[in-house]
């Protein structure tokens, strides 16, 4: 087998915005690529390092000795020293990596955003050219079904992300993420069963992501800097994969691209983690690409590149035509030995601009979005108070030159606007409806759940995130407190957030946490306040309906639940609550219909057979009632309630002995 191995987390500038020409004809071959018709395309293995800073990599100059495996791989690869991510969040950045398009084109601008079927997608393209395709994910955040990252499984024969479905308890490694070595083990198991022929594997490692909880011995070894422990552990996982590729004879023939999707602020500029700001701590990412047989191995490229360049690079390397819709540029021209040696500072690549953005602050907090352009020696950030930094003299971006160098800022601002205009597709995506369980899992990962309410307003309007970043940090800390079962502290902190920055999302989160404490009387007004601010939040309607059910306000719960199922017909849990609410309010025909709906999704639902049996009995359908109550008994033989309700039906039928028998059975089961 042959393959390409990629570790993601970097971005490339847009050539068309700079008015440049392509570095290499899109369908030309690299020197490493065989051109005979009998040649076998190399295998492709994509490994993305989530939340991994460039300055932690030994091959990029770090002295922390965290990445021996990656450093060894880098010696046989082309290393890009200035690679930049387009978005400091996992789904948008991975969408850029895999589509070769900018966020304003693929429209995956946050969590929950679907990847459109008409956007070019590397797995689907390669599958069409005979590649077998598989993905192995380290976090629920890339689960390919609503409401996480819908559409990301397009083109994959295998998309291994369902580990969280089997999770129990509160352990995050059973519910929202899994260790890197486990991800690698699944990938290797797939390789063991894989038949001959080209393949594409994507391996996603999440171990550097907060709350920075690496396994031993990394937990103890890096106790003072646990983020570094996650980096060291993910490097260990990469090493296991590389070792097995070599043992199986796959390493030499493979293309291996290693990158992070984004970095981590670690307190820089006041941001604890990532998602909001666009400084180097979260946007400058590691990127290396090993060509088959280590062609050009050891070469270092200092030209500015972007993650959007990865997809066309991979396609060109394996001889697959690059779709015209792809906006990145193939990097093979920079990697080819003769071209780089002949003109190492070619104007074509010397200063391509790099674009990045984050709409996360707008979508989730109601603040302004941020956009940036790295061009020549400058970092320009488009914000309510724009920013300009001289990267050569101020690499930490501490001295804003936007006022003193207004002409430069004006020029870069115009270039940024032009780039956005040239790379948008004119469409507007909407987030998938977020169910409460999914909302809690995103919270455990430190992310807000976007209701979509702020999509109605201009993303470039609102407070400057620089003035509000502590709010984002407080929310993140509250999420971690909630996950670690410190309920009262997390609720108190969230109430402080609401006092300073009231949004529908925060009120919904507060209502959810209060419900978890069974404090329904406080949860109800919080959820009603959320709906005042965002009447279209279906998840909040569901939470309010559920809360009202728990307080036995069935009449109040019904309209809330009805709003959800009208928009999301397959919201099975809402149908389950509705069947009970209708039954308790004597709307029996509607209760029967809801039971039948639920059973259409799950023919083993005990509660639906129970309510259906009782409701049919109350409408005079004794035969149907007994039939469904018996099905309930078959599912749960030790449950007393179906026997008690069967007794009522037998009474209606005048079968007193049968009624007495069922009541006796119900009484016996109640005492067991």
What are these regions (language model features)?
Residues 3, 9-546, 550-553, 559, ...:
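Catalytic domains that recognize anionic headgroups
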Residues 496-499, 529-532, 563-566, 596-600, ...:
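Conserved structural position within tetratricopeptide repeats
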Residues 572-607, 613-614:
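Eukaryotic tandem repeat interaction scaffolds
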Residues 604-653:
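Ankyrin-repeat and related helical/solenoid repeat scaffolds used for protein-protein interactions
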Residues 641-672:
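Terminal, low-structured helical/coil segments at or just beyond the last alpha-helical repeat
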């Amino acid at each position: 087998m042959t393959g390409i191995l990629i570790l993601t987390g970097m971005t490339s500038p847009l050539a068309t915005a700079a008015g440049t020409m392509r570095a290499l004809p899109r369908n030309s071959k690299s020197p490493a690529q065989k051109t005979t018709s009998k040649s076998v395309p190399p295998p492709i293995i994509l490994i993305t390092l989530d939340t991994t800073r460039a300055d932690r990599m030994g091959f990029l100059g770090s002295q922390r000795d965290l990445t021996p495996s990656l450093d060894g791989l880098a010696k046989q690869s082309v290393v890009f020293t200035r690679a930049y991510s387009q978005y400091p969040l996992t789904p948008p950045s991975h969408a850029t990596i895999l589509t070769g398009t900018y966020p304003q084109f693929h429209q995956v601008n946050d969590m929950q955003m679907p990847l459109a079927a008409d956007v070019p997608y590397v797995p689907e393209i390669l599958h069409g050219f005979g590649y077998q395709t598989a993905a192995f994910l380290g976090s629920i955040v890339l689960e390919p079904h609503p409401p996480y990252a819908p559409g990301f499984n397009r083109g994959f024969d295998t998309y291994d992300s369902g580990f969280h479905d089997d999770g129990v308890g509160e352990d995050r490694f059973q519910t929202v993420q899994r260790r890197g070595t486990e991800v690698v083990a699944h990938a290797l198991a797939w390789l063991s069963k894989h038949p001959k022929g080209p393949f594409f594997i994507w391996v996603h490692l999440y171990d550097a992501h907060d709350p920075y909880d690496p396994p031993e011995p990394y937990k103890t070894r890096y106790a003072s800097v646990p983020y570094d422990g996650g980096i060291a552990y993910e490097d260990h996982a990469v090493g296991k994969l590389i070792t097995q590729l070599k043992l199986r004879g796959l390493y030499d023939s493979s293309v291996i691209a290693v990158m992070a999707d984004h970095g981590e602020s670690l307190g820089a500029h006041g941001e604890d983690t990532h998602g909001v700001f666009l400084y180097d701590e979260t946007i400058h990412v590691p990127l290396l690409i090993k060509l088959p047989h280590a062609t050009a191995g050891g070469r270092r490229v200092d030209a500015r590149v972007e993650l959007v360049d990865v997809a066309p690079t991979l396609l060109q390397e394996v001889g697959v035509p690059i779709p015209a819709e792809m906006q990145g540029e193939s990097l093979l021209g920079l990697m080819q030995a003769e071209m780089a040696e002949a003109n190492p500072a070619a104007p074509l690549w010397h200063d391509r601009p790099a674009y990045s953005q984050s709409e996360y602050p707008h979508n989730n907090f109601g603040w302004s979005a941020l956009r940036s352009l790295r061009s020549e020696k400058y970092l320009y950030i488009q914000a309510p108070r724009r920013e300009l930094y001289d990267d050569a003299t101020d690499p930490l971006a501490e001295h804003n030159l936007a006022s003193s160098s207004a002409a430069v800022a004006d020029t870069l601002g115009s270039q940024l606007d032009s780039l956005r205009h040239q790379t948008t597709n004119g469409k507007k995506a909407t987030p998938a409806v977020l169910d409460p369980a999914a909302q809690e899992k995103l919270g455990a990962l430190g992310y807000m759940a976007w209701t979509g309410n702020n999509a109605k307003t201009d993303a470039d309007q609102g407070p400057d995130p620089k003035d509000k970043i502590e709010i984002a940090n407080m929310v993140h800390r509250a999420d971690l407190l909630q996950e670690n079962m410190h309920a009262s502290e997390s609720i108190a902190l969230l109430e402080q957030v609401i006092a300073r920055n009231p949004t529908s999302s925060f009120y919904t989160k507060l209502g959810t946490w209060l419900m978890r404490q069974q404090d329904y009387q406080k949860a109800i007004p919080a959820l009603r306040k959320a709906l005042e601010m965002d009447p279209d939040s279906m998840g909040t309607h569901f939470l309010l309906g559920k809360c009202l059910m728990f307080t036995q306000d069935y009449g109040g719960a019904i309209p809330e639940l009805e709003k959800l199922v009208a928009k999301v017909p397959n919201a099975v849990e809402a149908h389950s609550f509705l069947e009970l609410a209708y039954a308790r309010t004597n709307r029996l025909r509607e209760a029967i219909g809801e039971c039948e709906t639920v059973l259409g999704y799950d023919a083993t639902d005990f509660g639906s057979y129970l309510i259906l049996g009782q409701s049919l009995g109350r409408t005079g359908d004794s035969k149907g009632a007994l039939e469904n109550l018996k099905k309930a008994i078959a599912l749960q033989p030790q449950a007393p309630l179906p026997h008690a309700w069967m007794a009522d039906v037998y009474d209606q039928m005048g079968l007193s002995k049968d009624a007495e028998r069922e009541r006796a059975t119900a009484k016996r089961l109640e005492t067991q």
